[in-house]
């Protein structure tokens, strides 16, 4: 049984993780953290997420956590750097499901991965990992298309624009397809849309669209747990969700 703690326990992803762990006997939730100002501090994590009581209270300090196998961070970028430092100092595997990092933040993350197994996952959906696999298998011939762009749709409350997933896909494509111009990203924020990311390849004669749509937010929690289980057995290093099926 893998012992898990969550930083950012009260957000959408954090609550989805609590729900998923409560239904999976391979995992045990033994700690959760949120900011000091959070009104849920001191509450039972299970009850907070609408599950049965698990006698694990939400804390405001990473230092309150017991020894864990994997720390999953789904907080904001500025707070997740505390998780990076904590995991590094406590020799704990870390899954970062956070976006919005600055260049200096990425340097800190890469440096920490020399000391711990660290999975950086702006999107923990296995479908996005499979989409990248398709690109890997076909990248040698994709230069046939003159135009390459990414479009994304998110709910109106999504903070980062473009999303971390779109930036990650753009970087992934740029490393595999030689292009002179940058990849354009079109972003839509409205209502409570199902999350969608689309890669569009075209020329004057034809067009291909590779699309991934998240029909339920539980896919991110499920993917994160798959990633956590995989990460625990890995040596120190910086990993992505694509590495799980490489």
Give residue spans per PLM region.
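Nucleotide donor/acceptor-binding cores
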Residues: 2
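Rossmann-fold NAD(P) dinucleotide-binding segment
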Residues: 62-70, 74, 78-96, 108
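Short, ordered loop/turn segments at secondary-structure junctions
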Residues: 99-101, 123-124, 153-155
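Structural detector of well-ordered beta-strand residues that form the stable sheet scaffold
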Residues: 30, 57-59, 93-95, 117-119
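Rossmann-fold NAD(P)-binding glycine/threonine-rich loop
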Residues: 78, 84-85, 98-118, 129
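C-terminal substrate-binding/catalytic lobe of Rossmann-fold NAD(P)-dependent oxidoreductases
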Residues: 5-7, 12-65, 142-246
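Rossmann-fold dehydrogenase core element
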Residues: 93, 108-125, 146-148
């Amino acid at each position: 049984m893998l012992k898990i703690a969550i930083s950012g326990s009260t957000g959408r992803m954090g609550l989805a993780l609590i729900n998923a762990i409560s239904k999976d006997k391979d995992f045990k939730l033994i700690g959760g953290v949120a900011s000091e100002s959070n009104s849920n501090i001191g509450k039972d994590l299970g009850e907070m997420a609408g599950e049965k009581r698990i006698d694990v209270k939400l804390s405001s300090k990473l230092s309150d956590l017991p020894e864990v196998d994997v720390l999953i961070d789904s907080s904001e970028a500025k707070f997740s750097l505390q998780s990076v430092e904590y995991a590094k100092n406590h020799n704990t595997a870390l899954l970062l499901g956070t976006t919005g990092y600055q260049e200096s933040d990425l340097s800190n993350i890469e440096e920490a991965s020399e000391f711990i197994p660290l999975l950086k996952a702006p999107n923990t959906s296995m479908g996005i990992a499979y989409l990248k696999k398709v690109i890997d298998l076909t990248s040698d011939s994709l230069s046939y298309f003159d135009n390459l762009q990414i479009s994304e749709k998110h709910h109106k409350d999504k903070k980062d624009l473009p999303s971390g997933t779109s930036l990650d896909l753009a970087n992934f494509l740029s490393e595999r397809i030689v292009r002179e111009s940058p990849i354009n990203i079109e972003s839509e924020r409205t209502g409570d849309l199902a999350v969608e990311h689309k890669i569009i390849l075209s020329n004057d004669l034809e067009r291909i669209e590779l699309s991934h749509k998240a029909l339920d937010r539980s896919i991110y929690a499920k993917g994160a747990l798959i990633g956590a289980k995989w990460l625990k057995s890995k040596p120190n290093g910086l990993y992505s969700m694509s590495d799980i099926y490489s």
